[in-house]
Structures are given as C-alpha cells and as structure tokens.
C-alpha cells in the first residue's frame, strides 16, 4: 500500500502552484481546489461549473460514505473559481478531459500530481495529498482537531491526527530530542 503525505511546506505548495500554473490552467485549479476544499478526489472530479460558481458552499455526496455534505467554499477559493469558470458553461465539468469532455479520471489526476511533485522535488504524493494538505494546514493554523475531525468525517481525533501526518511529525521530533544512547 502506497502511503501519501500532506505537503507540509508552504513554500513547496507555492512551488507546485507555480509549476501547474505555468503548465495548465485546469491542473492548477485541480490542485488549488483540492487543497482548499477537503474533498476526496473522487468527489472533486465530477463537479460541474454550476456546483461552485457564485456559491458560498457546495453540496457533495461523499463517494466513500454516501453521505450528503455541505462544504463551505473559502473566500480565497471563490476568486480562483470565478477566474477559472468565467468563460465556461454551467453544465461543463470543472476538470474535463480535452479529448472526451468528461471528467478526467482519478488515474489522470494522479499523474498530474505526481508529475508536479517530481518537478518540485516532492515524494510520497498522490491524489489524497490534496485532502491531507488541507487537513494538515487547517490543524496547524487552528489546532482544532475536533472541528477538523468533523470536516473530514473521521470517527476519532486519533484517526484524524494520523491521517494528516501529525503522529509522524511528533514521533520524528521525539526521536530527535532523544538523540540516542
């Protein structure tokens, strides 16, 4: 099983953003949307313009849990949504394939992110990195694990901490302090 990590460094996030912005508008928006929405890639890819344009929130039926959830759209993301969708039709998919006009596949999304990660010197990156990155930075800024647990729809705080890589960070720091015998 391939374990993926959040992108912990804000500088690396900016580097990935710049790389994708220079490469492809759709791919850049996929990254921006993913790290700012806390949605799974399987819930992001089928979204259409009408789901997000001029909205304060979106409704998503989670593919994993089948629960319908109201997802707030961050103010910072609203401008990105406007810029990306202003010339699109409301029934267009946000992340459509140039060839089929249908949503890109999870495999294609994975390839996009892996290519950007490799170009920016990141390892252990996959589609789940987007959601984990949201969680990691939400926690770093708010320290509110209960709210993050609710946002991510996890059953316990310990699952959320492990999911966003905080357990690993804590263990690494403890080993560093210990230093050895």
From Swiss-Prot:
An example GO BP is: establishment of integrated proviral latency
DNA-binding as a keyword of this entry, yes or no, is yes
Ordered alphabetically, the record's keywords are:
DNA integration, DNA recombination, DNA-binding, Viral genome integration, Virus entry into host cell
Domain named Tyr recombinase: residues:
3-176
A GO MF annotation of the entry reads: site-specific recombinase activity
| Pfam families from the UniProt entry | Phage_integrase
| The keyword Kinase is assigned to this record | no
- Gene3D superfamilies recorded for this chain? Intergrase catalytic core
Q: Which residues form the active site?
A: 40, 64, 128, 131, 154, 163
Which family does the similarity line name? Belongs to the 'phage' integrase family.
Q: What is this protein called?
A: Probable integrase/recombinase YoeC
Q: Which organism is it from?
A: Bacillus subtilis (strain 168)
């Amino acid at each position: 099983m391939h374990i993926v990590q959040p992108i912990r460094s804000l500088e690396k996030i900016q580097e990935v953003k710049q790389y994708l912005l220079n490469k492809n508008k759709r791919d850049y928006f996929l990254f921006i949307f993913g790290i700012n929405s806390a949605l799974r890639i399987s819930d992001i890819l089928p979204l259409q313009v009408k789901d997000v344009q001029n909205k304060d929130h979106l409704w998503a039926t989670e593919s994993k849990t089948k629960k319908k959830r109201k997802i707030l759209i961050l103010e910072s993301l609203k401008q990105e949504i406007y810029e990306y969708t202003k010339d699109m039709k409301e029934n267009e998919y946000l992340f459509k394939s140039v060839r089929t006009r249908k949503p890109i596949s999870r495999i294609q999304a994975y390839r996009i992110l892996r290519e950007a990660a490799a170009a920016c010197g990141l390892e252990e990156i996959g589609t789940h990195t987007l959601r984990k990155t949201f969680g990691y930075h939400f926690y770093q800024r708010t320290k509110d694990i209960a709210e993050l647990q609710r946002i991510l729809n996890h059953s316990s705080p310990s699952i959320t901490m492990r999911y966003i890589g905080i357990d690993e960070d804590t263990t690494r720091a403890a080993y560093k302090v210990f230093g050895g015998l």
